[in-house]
């Protein structure tokens, strides 16, 4: 309490509500978008805070490398500096939470997409040999009730097979599945 004739202590200013709401708490709802839940935003914020070791509400290249590595992503120096260059909209040389969220959302969706494609590949690779063969395609076509002759199935393999060994590796399969147009 202020004594008579004394001014009360000045109120501390709060950070603008870009990452915190009026009560000073982080509001994940501000960052939710299609394909990203509040829970995922909070998990990414926890990672951001964990690696914002100096508490500046931004992550520098050294902190970003540690964050990406801990989340299971490859983090070469050249990649890190390229990420910062691509995402650093304010030219600070660092990434704030909104920029970090954009990066992680892209990486998560890339990782999830690859995992989903791996599951589909495994459905075709019935012998778990790490490749899809004519025999595998024949079996899947039969299970799906498709009537395709071996020449049609072989043509499918030939289109996807990058090294001409008459087998489709996961890499071949992934490339076909993520291709925007088919020749």
Swiss-Prot record:
InterPro entries, per database record: CALM/Myosin/TropC-like (IPR050230), EF-hand-dom_pair (IPR011992), EF_Hand_1_Ca_BS (IPR018247), EF_hand_dom (IPR002048)
Cellular localisation: Cytoplasm, Cytoskeleton
Matching PROSITE patterns: EF_HAND_1, EF_HAND_2
Record-listed Ca(2+) 2 binding positions: 88, 90, 92, 94, 99
Residues annotated for Ca(2+) 1 binding in this entry: 52, 54, 56, 58, 63
GO-annotated cellular components: cytoplasm; cytoskeleton
Region Disordered: start-end pairs: 1-30
Domain EF-hand: 39-74, 75-110, 112-147, 148-183
Keywords: Calcium, Cytoplasm, Cytoskeleton, Metal-binding, Repeat
Pfam hit, one: EF-hand_7
SMART domains hit by this protein: EFh
Superkingdom per UniProt: Eukaryota
GO terms, molecular function: calcium ion binding
Chief site of localization: cytoplasm
Record text on subunit structure and interactions: Monomer.
Function: Plays a fundamental role in microtubule organizing center structure and function. Component of the infraciliary lattice (ICL) and the ciliary basal bodies.
PANTHER family: EF-HAND SUPERFAMILY PROTEIN, MYOSIN LIGHT CHAIN 1, 3
Family: Belongs to the centrin family.
Name of this chain's protein: Caltractin ICL1c
Source species of the chain: Paramecium tetraurelia
């Amino acid at each position: 309490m202020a004594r008579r004739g004394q001014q009360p202590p000045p109120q501390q200013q709060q950070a603008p509500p870009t990452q915190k709401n009026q009560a000073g708490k982080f509001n994940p709802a501000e960052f939710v978008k299609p394909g990203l839940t509040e829970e995922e935003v909070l998990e990414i914020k926890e990672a951001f805070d964990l690696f914002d070791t100096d508490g500046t509400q931004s992550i520098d290249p050294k902190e970003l490398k540690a964050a990406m590595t801990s989340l299971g992503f490859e983090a070469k120096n050249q990649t890190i500096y390229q990420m910062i260059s691509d995402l650093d909209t304010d030219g600070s040389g660092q990434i704030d939470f909104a920029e970090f969220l954009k990066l992680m959302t892209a990486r998560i969706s890339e990782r999830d997409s690859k995992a989903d494609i791996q599951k589909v590949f495994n459905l075709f690779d019935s012998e778990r040999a790490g490749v899809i063969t004519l025999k595998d395609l024949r079996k899947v076509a039969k299970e799906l009730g498709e009537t395709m002759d071996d020449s049609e199935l072989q043509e499918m393999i030939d289109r996807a097979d990058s090294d001409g060994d008459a087998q489709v590796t996961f890499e071949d399969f992934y490339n076909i599945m993520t291709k925007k147009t088919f020749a």
